[in-house]
Amino acid sequence: MSGKGGKAGSAAKASQSRSAKAGLTFPVGRVHRLLRKGNYAQRIGSGAPVYLTAVLEYLAAEILELAGNAARDNKKTRIIPRHLQLAIRNDDELNKLLGNVTIAQGGVLPNIHQNLLPKKSSKAKASQEL
């Protein structure tokens, strides 16, 4: 008989990471370690790093999805900081969340004030109608 109370001779199950258990790609163990080392609280619950990792993974996926769409709109196959900037600034919620963030090499959104645009005159309309 084995010392662990199980059946004798049964193979031990391979260990599974917390990321794999939660179905995540981002590392739960690393986030847990960073929460402990960061002195955010005296104690860190076991569910907190899993939840935080899931939120971080979701945000990263959302931003990359929008940046990929921006890259495709510009006929590019590689995401550059400009595409990240366009993705974040054109999305209301992400822009609110990352409003104070500066993205290096991101540029600005194209915007021309209405007063600077050429005025539509009635003479131009009359000449077009003839």
From Swiss-Prot:
The feature of type site (Not ubiquitinated) is located at 119
Looking at the record's lineage, which domain of life comes first?
Eukaryota
Give the family from UniProt: Belongs to the histone H2A family.
UniProt PTM: Phosphorylated to form H2AS128ph (gamma-H2A) in response to DNA double-strand breaks (DSBs) generated by exogenous genotoxic agents and by stalled replication forks. Phosphorylation is dependent on the DNA damage checkpoint kinases MEC1/ATR and TEL1/ATM, spreads on either side of a detected DSB site and may mark the surrounding chromatin for recruitment of proteins required for DNA damage signaling and repair. Acetylated by ESA1 to form H2AK4ac and H2AK7ac.
Q: What does this protein do?
A: Core component of nucleosome which plays a central role in DNA double strand break (DSB) repair. Nucleosomes wrap and compact DNA into chromatin, limiting DNA accessibility to the cellular machineries which require DNA as a template. Histones thereby play a central role in transcription regulation, DNA repair, DNA replication and chromosomal stability. DNA accessibility is regulated via a complex set of post-translational modifications of histones, also called histone code, and nucleosome remodeling.
The record describes its quaternary structure and partners as: The nucleosome is a histone octamer containing two molecules each of H2A, H2B, H3 and H4 assembled in one H3-H4 heterotetramer and two H2A-H2B heterodimers. The octamer wraps approximately 147 bp of DNA.
Q: Which PROSITE patterns match?
A: HISTONE_H2A
- Report the locations given in the UniProt record: Nucleus; Chromosome
- This protein's species is Kluyveromyces lactis (strain ATCC 8585 / CBS 2359 / DSM 70799 / NBRC 1267 / NRRL Y-1140 / WM37)
Key words, A-Z: Acetylation, Chromosome, DNA damage, DNA repair, DNA-binding, Methylation, Nucleosome core, Nucleus, Phosphoprotein
Positions carrying N6-acetyllysine = 4, 7
Reply yes or no: does the keyword DNA damage apply.
yes
Extra notes?
Answer: In contrast to vertebrates and insects, its C-terminus is not monoubiquitinated. There are 2 genes for histone H2A in K.lactis.
Q: What is known of its domains?
A: The [ST]-Q motif constitutes a recognition sequence for kinases from the PI3/PI4-kinase family.
Full protein name? Histone H2A
Q: Where is this motif: [ST]-Q motif?
A: 127-128
GO biological process terms, semicolon-separated: DNA repair
The cross-references to PANTHER family, in alphabetical order and at most eight, read: HISTONE H2A
- List, alphabetically, the GO terms of the cellular component aspect: CENP-A containing nucleosome; nucleus
* Record bears the keyword DNA damage: yes
Please give the positions of the paired cysteines in each disulfide bond.
Answer: none
Q: What positions are modified (Phosphoserine)?
A: 127
* N5-methylglutamine found at: 105
